Amino acid sequence: MDEMDNVIRSLEQEYRLILLLNHRNKNQHRAASWYGSFNEMKRNCGQIITLFSSRRLQAKRLKDVEWVKLHRLLQRALFRQLKRWYWQFNGVIALGQFVTLGCTLVTLLANVRALYMRLWEINETEFIRCGCLIKNLPRTKAKSVVNDVEELGEIIDEDIGNNVQENELVITSIPKPLTENCKKKKKRKKKNKSAIDGIFG
């Protein structure tokens, strides 16, 4: 649990930096596309911190429902949203106008990802216990058991499927569309153009 507390304290520190960055940039950048990803990261991190702060203040274990919620938040962030967040923040650097802001965002994202992965590893047994993860059992090689009494069938010759001759192939013709049902377009005569039409088009 000591390692868990260290990870939570580090995550709280990163969350404070995220909040400062949010407060500093929300008026100027709130319409930018990367800001939506930043806001998602802020909310996700805030929800995880809220789960753990209640546990630490009351010195209790998390309930199963809270473990499931933590698993859902970590899984969504790590395996679905993280790549999109990275590309959005990297786009800020690529624009060249706010390079320091982009570098700060990518650094925060890297730190948050490392802490999320650490939380995932530490709490893996709890996730398995709650049924969020399936424990990977070592696979044993399945030995094929052949019962001598049971009939396995007859051996099929490989040439059975190749007995089709060219004469047996049937060529089907494509039916032609009926011309009676189709409407015929009437040809219009071109109007005689005058000299003025030739000039003005």
Curated annotation (Swiss-Prot):
Parts of the chain that traverse the membrane: 86-108
GO biological-process terms attached to the record: maturation of 5.8S rRNA; maturation of 5.8S rRNA from tricistronic rRNA transcript (SSU-rRNA, 5.8S rRNA, LSU-rRNA); nuclear-transcribed mRNA catabolic process, RNase MRP-dependent
Pfam family, one: RMP1
Gene Ontology CC terms, in alphabetical order: cytoplasm; membrane; nucleolus; nucleus; ribonuclease MRP complex
Primary location class: membrane
Molecular function terms, GO-annotated: rRNA primary transcript binding
Keywords associated with the record: Cytoplasm, Membrane, Nucleus, rRNA processing, Transmembrane, Transmembrane helix
Membrane topology, record value: Single-pass membrane protein
Subcellular locations according to the entry: Membrane; Cytoplasm; Nucleus
Disulphide connectivity of cysteines: none
UniProt subunit comment: Component of RNase MRP complex which consists of an RNA moiety and at least 10 protein subunits including POP1, POP3, POP4, POP5, POP6, POP7, POP8, RMP1, RPP1 and SNM1, many of which are shared with the RNase P complex.
Note: Present with 556 molecules/cell in log phase SD medium.
Role played: Functions as part of ribonuclease MRP (RNase MRP), which is involved in rRNA processing in mitochondria.
Protein name from the UniProt record: Ribonuclease MRP protein subunit RMP1
Name of the gene encoding the protein in the UniProt record: RMP1
